[in-house]
Amino acid sequence: MSKADELRLLREAIKNFPDALAVWSRDGQLVACSDAYARLAAAAPISEAAEYQSADGRWLRRSVRALDDGGRIELLADISDLRRAEQASRFVAYHDSLTGLPNRRLLDDRLRQAIRLAQRRDRMVATLLVHLDDFGRVNDTLGDGAADTVLREVAERLTRCVRKADTLARAAVDEFALVVCDLKDAADCRVVAEKVTQALAPEFRVGGRTLRLKASIGVSLFPADGGDGEALLRSADAARYRARQLRR
């Protein structure tokens, strides 16, 4: 077989290679590429990054190997499934499985971010703890399934009380936390607290029954009530406890 035939067969093999593969000369000229690579290159320029998202939404990992003659082989591997698995794993690690809200781990991180932003902009951060005082009774009377339904409904109602920039998290079994960012006036926090009270006031319908929940709310403000997230949560919890005692 002549060298010309060998080269033709090699080009044909590369052209039909199932993955995105390209062979480059040492002076940067494209020698041959697979159809998969050609389709990617036609849709958008190939990125020099090790990993990137293509025009069609796929995540690609780019690897390059040097050839003895100074050229190189470039391979693009589709890692979309791996990326989705990583994203799902991160979501599980940072979110409550029942309500889909941020969990305590993510709440702590969001608080740190909110405080850093407030320090740069000379603003306040409000932390509200909402405790469902008689949730244990719901659980004991109606069972776990009904209790879960109530918690999901509480989460939906509270979601309507915050802005996109704010955070609503499930801080404990029967407790939710709201982080309200970038406040100019402490009065804005009272507005949010009133929204929460109004959101939880209507009856909950579960399994053909109706019930009302009593909730106690505690509020703390950065920087007046604490300089970090842990201090703000402690202060809000103390305020919540005082509010509950006063109501009795």
Where are these regions (language model features)?
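Sensory modules in modular signal-transduction proteins
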Residues: 3-29, 35
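Signal-transducing coiled-coil linker helices
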Residues: 12-15, 59-97, 104-116, 166-167
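Core hydrophobic beta-sheet residues of small sensory/regulatory alpha/beta domains
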Residues: 23, 30, 120, 127-129
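PAS/LOV sensory domain surfaces, especially short acidic/polar patches at coil-to-helix junctions
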Residues: 27-38, 132, 238
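Conserved long alpha-helical elements within nucleotide-processing catalytic cores of c-di-GMP signaling
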Residues: 90, 100-126, 133-163, 169-173, ...
